[in-house]
């Protein structure tokens, strides 16, 4: 009689369980990575605003940023940078669509609209606020604790 070599049912169930466990850990890492990436994008927006302010002061030219629900684009000198938001980044409210800094680094008034104001974001269940102060143009990034 020939003896057949094969896996037992218990061995197969254990192997499938281990594989499923490893796959679920990988799925959790992707969710965490997306949250971190979304938060970093909001921080990058605040840093880009600070960069625009400083660039306009140093080079004595106007700089601007256009903000939308999908992302933003900045114009400085002859250069343009466009950033598309992560799907987790949600622009909740803002009184700014276009932000312009004068050649002295101050928020300018174009078409009777101020470039100073507040931008509110949410990433999953966390909220962030970016403020631009009216006279000085100082940019603040605040994580709102609930």
Name every feature range the model reports, one short phrase each.
Residues 1-30:
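N-terminal single-pass transmembrane signal-anchor helix
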Residues 21, 25-35, 39, 47, ...:
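N-terminal helix-rich module
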